[in-house]
Amino acid sequence: MGVADEKEIEIVRPKGLGVRHAQTALLFFGMLFAFTMRVNMSMAIVDMTDERNEVYFAWPHSVQAVILSSFFWGYVILQIPAGMLARRFGGKVLFTISVSVNSLLSLLLPVGAAWGGWRLVCTCRVLQGLTQAFIYPSTHHLVSQWMPLQEKGFLTTLVYAGGQLGIALQLLASGFLATSWGWQAIFYANGTLGALWSVTYIIFGADSPERSRFISKEEVLYIQTSLGRVGEQKKYPAPWLKIMTSLPFWAVIVAHCGQNWGFFTLMTEMPTYMSKVLNVNLKNNGILSSLPYLSMYLLSFVMGYMTDVIVRKKWLSVTNTRKFFNTIGLWGPAIALIGLSYCPEGNMVYAVVMLTVAVGINAGQYTGYMLVHIDLAPNFSACLMGITNFLANIISIIAPLVCGFIVQDETEPSEWRKVFFVAAGVYFFTNLFFVLFSTSVRQPWNEPKETDVEMKPAEIKEPEKSKLEAKWSRR
């Protein structure tokens, strides 16, 4: 079935919940546990370096910045190979390896800190980053296989929202774990939960509807028809030259880089800002630091639902829908960070509100540039995500280091103001580039002899006997 055929196709939509929803739930929790292990150091390091503790590590802020960024050293290295491996071997095995290895390293990290100090901690974090490099490419591959176009906005948002809930829960729980059982409990809890998820996903996860042991023929037909395919997808060689010379793809790269600069600046430095500038104790620090990510988690569902409605009712084209939500997701935080820069001294409520808005409204990116990889070339979505994530996470390394360079006195609000202004500027200009040059038109290099046509939602009718269903039954 060619993409060039613009006629709307009648699709049989199964009633009730299906296996695609179970896969969505599994990926949601996998993303949640992966992100708890990604960000646990941001809170743990506050307690690990607290002089009031009987045992603490006297690491200066520059060393702490190195530790916080070390995860991304490993994370960046394997991004492009991860995209190619996900496309070749499927997302399930890579996602499982990522979470299970991260869980083991999380369990070992407290011992590493006691034996080898910050150098061994960095080694553990680099190894965690190396294996988490598979998370986004494998998830994008799985999403491209499982999510029907008419449900893609909400279901994809649900999967990636697991990461934000993971951050929120981690920040919320870390303070209680550290004050009750010590900072080591943070890593032990993460490792145990991640290991339990890995076993569950090995049993119930699947790379595609065609490979699931539990799915009905009706649901397979629905997903296949919605995505414009029947049977297993062909695997074409990646057209690297065409990919890297595609201006719409570069618009996605730029947006992803801008997103990572602002997001990871706040994710890694917010607990320190709360502690040193707002004078918030560790337990309250965790609660207040979690609020922005809880708001992002909740708003992601609102924006995912709105995206599906807008696309289904054709109020905007798919291209303009992506641009609209990406603008909310990047320019909204830019405005909030400028507001945060002028926070009145000692006004903790104002600062928390601005941080909550800055992170919460960033949920727009999930139905913005994050879906354009799949729009442009569903056959190569894992490869595209690997490339953009590789480049964007170089930014994730640089951003905390730049913050460490700018902020010499952690208690001085004027130095943090510079950090927030830089992040706001990056948000603004990268989204401007995305708005000017991005598109959701499927690219001709996605499949041989295909024509560019913007992806359109097919009309969904009540279940009835279809030619595709008859064809399936004859197999």
Predicted ranges, named:
Residues 1-45, 55-58:
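Cytosolic juxtamembrane N-terminal segment immediately preceding the first transmembrane helix
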Residues 41-42, 244-301, 363-370, 374, ...:
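Extracytoplasmic gate region of multi-pass secondary transporters
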Residues 100-115, 327-345:
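C-terminal ends and interior cores of transmembrane alpha-helices
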